[in-house]
Amino acid sequence: MSHQKIATSQRHEKACTSKTTYKDWLPHLQRRVKCDEALPVCQSCGSANRECRWPKPNDNIDRRFLSHRQSRHHKRALDDDVSVVAQEAPNDDQKVISIDRSQTLVLHSLEPAMAHQAMAHVLEPIICRHFVDIYYGLIILPGCHSDFYHGWLTEILRLMSSHKSLYYSVLACATSHLHSIGECVQMRELALTYYSRAITKLSQLLVAPSQPETNDGLLTSIILLYIHGCMGWGTYSDIPRHLNAAMSIIALRLWNRPMGIDRLFDFLAVESVLYHIFHMTTGLWTELSGPNYDSYIDFWYQAENLLDRSSCNTPSRRLASPVIGIPIALFRLALLLRQQRRNSLPLSIDMQSVQSEVFGYEMMLFGSQEPQSTSESSNTQEEYYKDAGSLYAIIVSLLWRQMLPYSEPGPPLEVMGGCWQIRRAIQIFKKYEHDDGWARCFIGNWPTYTLGFFMSATEDKQVIQVEMQRRWDLTKFAQVNRYIGDLQATWAARESQNGRL
């Protein structure tokens, strides 16, 4: 027994007196460096432009006080507020919102005050991930130039850390979208809370001594706020003031540049403002009045001229437009004819010039080939832009033919289903009837909605109805929901009127 103790003592002494070299510790030093797990995105992953693996809610629990009843990580509190369950087995009475491939966030009924406080800590990383993985791809055109797509997203994630207004704008947009997906009232209230915080932070930033025209975080926050008004819920009436703020910043930033736009973000910002000017001033067809068109037209002409002479406006950039995707002149012509229809006044512009533009787009439609199936196309996204442009050109043609100087204001009138414009539009819709990418592309929302007013045949209306419903199912944008309601109400009124005749 004594010999064993001596041997053990000798081994211990030898181990203690031996020198530990750098090579002995090298395996321990070569562990993979983890993300710093900072909100909204870790700096190392953000700078490397790689996917950031965010910690799951369970990874952030301090288990030392887990059993304490007042701990925010107490098991009962988690069960009452938010629980993460397997996606395969949600309960029928629960509101389910898909977050990623492996998990589903299940929101139980909560009191609003509890929802805003208890849910925020757990939800904000997940909401940010929803913005990155799902929402962002719906507010920028599919297949746009990679410098636009990845560049703007990387910039948003970088600026969120230092711009609280941008951080809350991102949360507001993503949370409102989650509300549309899951129809959870608490998520809508939470989205409006984030929206209010973003407005507060913006106000503080604007009164501080600074140069707003050089602040990309400020402009991005404003862009997301008017996108929230357009695509989200509860802030539609705020869009004009956000647009006016963005227009003022862009004017200060770009109007005096003789060489045009040389930064991709500025190009994207100008296109975004033009699209939402179009959205706001066109409004719903049943609205007899709307925003003052004259207050936007000067900005539109200057912005259009700026984009035309921009160094970013190369042929490859035009094919990969981040927001508009069709010729801006066609966009403007559709806006002009829609405005004339609303005001029911003689146009104060050169009618001959408008007629020449309309005939030019009609010749383009006649000269282009019949729509091919998407499987035959070498560039699907390019086909999206081309066919969306054809739909706008068809609308311009139909509006021009219905334009009378003193006609009654209101929606477009029905036309015969056999006319060439309607046949061409139906061909385009049937081409993409199984293409979800097309239905997610937001530039097709307005022409699909507008063409529904021209349809007279039941089968043609059915095509439009299916297309609009598919767009709602795939995007959950409030814009599409408003369009569907307006179109269906008009169809019902026309059927009722025809029944009385």
What is each residue range found by the language model?
Residues 1-159, 163, 383, 390, ...:
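Charge-rich, intrinsically disordered regulatory segments
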Residues 11, 15, 148-151, 155-158, ...:
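Cytosolic regulatory protein-protein interaction regions
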Residues 98-213, 284-285, 311-318, 371-386, ...:
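C-terminal transcriptional activation/regulatory domains of eukaryotic transcription factors
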Residues 125, 227-339:
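Acidic/serine-rich, low-complexity amphipathic helices located in mid- to C-terminal regulatory regions
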Residues 153-159, 171-184, 193-236, 246-252, ...:
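Hydrophobic/aromatic-rich effector regions of fungal transcription factors
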Residues 169, 220, 266, 271, ...:
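Residue register of alpha-helical TPR repeats
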Residues 456-501:
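C-terminal amphipathic "assembly/sorting" segment characterized by alternating charged
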